[in-house]
């Protein structure tokens, strides 16, 4: 599950949190979401207010099949940044995986409204659309 547009990390490249974040992203990109989640969780403990870490950790948790944890993380991003289209989309996917299609529907609609040009968001989600 990739965002349509990847935002740049919002913290200092020299920090320990950034190093952990980059390692987590590398593990995620290499198809190792559980290892990615370990690094990203450590980064989030160091920088608890960073939505870029929270969103990437949500992606890792989703890829690892930990949908409840992923939904919690994406819900936190949505609460902090209500116009984050990707967080709404990822929350919809997580809720769908948990069998909560009705709850997912609103977040999918919001993602589509916030970023109507994203082909990924326009693809139907079974049981949600």
Each predicted region: which residue ranges?
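TPR/TPR-like (Sel1-like) alpha-helical repeat modules
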Residues: 93-120, 126
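Structural signature of tandem alpha-helical TPR/SEL1-like repeats
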Residues: 2, 30-41, 64-76, 98-110
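Alpha-helical segment of the N-proximal tetratricopeptide repeat
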Residues: 13-46
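Long, contiguous interaction/recruitment modules in multidomain scaffold/adaptor proteins
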Residues: 1-15
């Amino acid at each position: 599950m990739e965002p349509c547009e990847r935002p740049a990390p919002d913290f200092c490249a020299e920090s320990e949190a950034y190093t952990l974040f980059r390692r987590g992203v590398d593990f995620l990109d290499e198809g190792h979401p559980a290892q990615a989640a370990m690094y990203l969780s450590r980064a989030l403990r160091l920088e608890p207010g960073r939505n870029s870490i929270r969103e990437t950790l949500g992606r890792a948790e989703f890829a690892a099949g930990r949908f409840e944890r992923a939904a919690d993380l994406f819900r936190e991003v949505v609460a902090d940044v209500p116009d984050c289209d990707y967080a709404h989309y990822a929350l919809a996917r997580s809720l769908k995986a948990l069998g909560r299609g009705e709850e997912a529907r609103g977040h999918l609609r919001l993602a589509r409204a916030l970023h109507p040009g994203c082909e990924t968001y326009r693809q139907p989600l079974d049981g949600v659309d």
